[in-house]
Amino acid sequence: MAVQQNRKTRSRRGMRRSHDALTGKTLSVDSTTGEKHLRHHVTPDGFYKGRKVVDVADDE
């Protein structure tokens, strides 16, 4: 098993963890439907940049 040779300081631990923060996904609001969606992705209704690009079938 690997065992550290020297104890790492709080500063070194913090510097290592400085890049581990999570970021939320950037959401946009569609201009036509007002629905939130991921950037550069089609909305679940089939709209992209305010235009209907995909015909979505109803599952009901």
Curated annotation (Swiss-Prot):
Region Disordered, residue ranges: 1-43
An MF annotation (GO) of this entry: structural constituent of ribosome
Keyword Ubl conjugation: no
Source organism superkingdom: Bacteria
Any coiled-coil regions, as ranges: none
One Gene Ontology cellular component: large ribosomal subunit
One Pfam family, short name: Ribosomal_L32p
Swiss-Prot/TrEMBL keywords: Ribonucleoprotein, Ribosomal protein
Positions with biased composition (Basic residues): 7-16
Claim: Ribosomal protein is one of the keywords in the record: yes
A Gene Ontology biological process term: translation
Protein family: Belongs to the bacterial ribosomal protein bL32 family.
HAMAP family, sorted: Ribosomal_bL32
UniProt xrefs under PANTHER family: 50S RIBOSOMAL PROTEIN L32, LARGE RIBOSOMAL SUBUNIT PROTEIN BL32
Protein name: Large ribosomal subunit protein bL32
Organism whose genome encodes this protein: Saccharophagus degradans (strain 2-40 / ATCC 43961 / DSM 17024)
Gene that specifies this protein: rpmF
